[in-house]
Amino acid sequence: SIKENDGKLVVKGVLQRANAKNQNGRVYPMEILQREAKNYEEGFIKQKRALGELDHPDSSVVNLQNVSHNITEMHFEGENLLGTVEILTTPSGNILRELFKNGIKLGISSRGMGSVEAIEEADGKPVMKVGKDFELIAFDFVSNPSTHGAFMYPLSENVDKTQVQEGRTCGSYCKTENIINKIIRGE
């Protein structure tokens, strides 16, 4: 993958999922996630400053000395927000690069600010619905993402048309993604 991308490591996968409870007990409503994805694309991706860090700092500011990657594209496929991420040649980016080269499975997690509202699910368990004031700050690489299936996979920047399934570019991971989505939906 690195050789095919002019020496750049590019990874793709699920960034976030709408209307599904994550491992932190939060649900991101579709309308809020769509709004923030659009704002993030306009304010950060198009300006080539959609930077993120390793791990998941509590800060509402991306610390440049810890930057490891840049989001280059994101789009919705159903309720999944998918994205393309370029790993940078920074000290933290080099750690990511080596982890990927060694076959380590890495996840990604959104960082944001805003309120949450406690609501009750049909089974009586509480869930935290992300409020309308939510603001997306960044996507950070983590070892254990809160969004089910939010893992990144090294892929060639040039999409192999034989790997496109129903307009999706998940390549050989389409089957895995379908299985994960069926489990999440309870099918």
What residue ranges belong to the model's regions?
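Short amphipathic alpha-helical segments that mediate assembly, nucleic-acid/protein binding
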Residues: 176-180
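Short conserved beta-strand and strand-loop elements enriched in small hydrophobics
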Residues: 40-62, 108
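Flexible loop/turn segments at secondary-structure boundaries
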Residues: 21-22, 59-62, 69-71, 117-119
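A short, polar/proline- and glycine-enriched secondary-structure boundary/capping micro-motif
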Residues: 23-25, 63, 93-97
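Short, solvent-exposed loop/turn motifs
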Residues: 27, 60-61, 126-127
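Short glycine-rich, polar/acidic loop-and-turn segments at beta strand-coil junctions
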Residues: 15-19, 54-58, 87
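Polar/acidic, low-complexity leader/linker segments enriched in S/T/G and N/D
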Residues: 1-46, 166-175, 185-186
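Residue microenvironments linked to proteolytic maturation
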Residues: 10-13, 50-51, 70-173
